[in-house]
């Protein structure tokens, strides 16, 4: 009946009234005691969320500073994983590289590009192949371990 009336040119389309179906959920929440408790627990868990986010930010900050000091002088090469978009030259680029590594995108290739005897940036003042470090193994594996297994699980546990 409503669609028949709405199809005529004189009336406004009344299909927006379907939005009021969502009001049934509010009525359901008022009646269900267990659903209210579950929702209250979910809201209360958000109080600990800023602390977990702060801990993750602190981990990224520490690893970005260490990465800039140890791997910041590696020459940029488009054929390796250390290129103009993916490097430790500045703090923001180091954070982006760490975020990319934390998501699991080719972190092992980045690690292998940071090993010792890599070419140095000409502006760094270092000789040709003394950049990089074998510390890259410990650096990247520990970062992936902390991000993937500890921080992500802690974040999910709070929610």
From Swiss-Prot:
Glycosylation: residue positions: 13
InterPro entries: Ion_trans_dom, VDCC_alpha-1_subunit, VDCCAlpha1
Sorted UniProt keywords: Calcium, Calcium channel, Calcium transport, Disulfide bond, Glycoprotein, Ion channel, Ion transport, Membrane, Phosphoprotein, Repeat, Transmembrane, Transmembrane helix, Transport, Voltage-gated channel
Post-translational modifications: Phosphorylated in vitro by CaM-kinase II, PKA, PKC and CGPK.
UniProt keyword annotation of Nucleotide-binding present: no
GO MF term set: voltage-gated calcium channel activity
Subcellular localization, as worded in the UniProt entry: Membrane
Functional summary from the UniProt entry: Voltage-sensitive calcium channels (VSCC) mediate the entry of calcium ions into excitable cells and are also involved in a variety of calcium-dependent processes, including muscle contraction, hormone or neurotransmitter release, gene expression, cell motility, cell division and cell death. This alpha-1B subunit gives rise to N-type calcium currents. N-type calcium channels belong to the 'high-voltage activated' (HVA) group. They are involved in pain signaling. Calcium channels containing alpha-1B subunit may play a role in directed migration of immature neurons.
Family affiliation: Belongs to the calcium channel alpha-1 subunit (TC 1.A.1.11) family. CACNA1B subfamily.
Domain notes: Each of the four internal repeats contains five hydrophobic transmembrane segments (S1, S2, S3, S5, S6) and one positively charged transmembrane segment (S4). S4 segments probably represent the voltage-sensor and are characterized by a series of positively charged amino acids at every third position.
Name of the protein: Voltage-dependent N-type calcium channel subunit alpha-1B
Organism of derivation: Gallus gallus (Chicken)
Gene assigned in the entry: CACNA1B
